[in-house]
Structures are given as structure tokens and as C-alpha cells.
UniProtKB/Swiss-Prot annotation:
This major soluble protein in olfactory sensilla of male moths might serve to solubilize the extremely hydrophobic pheromone molecules and to transport pheromone through the aqueous lymph to receptors located on olfactory cilia. It comes from Orgyia pseudotsugata. GO terms for molecular function: pheromone binding. Belongs to the PBP/GOBP family. This is Pheromone-binding protein. Keywords: Pheromone response, Pheromone-binding, Transport.
Amino acid sequence: SKEVMKSLSINFSKPLEVXKQEMGLQDAVMQDFYN
């Protein structure tokens, strides 16, 4: 059903957003480290 897919995509995208934020932080730290 659409509701199931909707909840699945929401539950999947939340950790994905967190991971992207963490990767962004790591990238910023590495850039600061090299500069």
C-alpha cells in the first residue's frame, strides 16, 4: 500500500539525512585539517 511505502521511505531517509550530515561534518573537518 502507499502508506507502507511512505513510512518505509521516511524511515529510510531519516538515517540517510543523518549520515549525509555526518559526512558533511567530516568533510569540513578534513578540509580544515589540510588547510
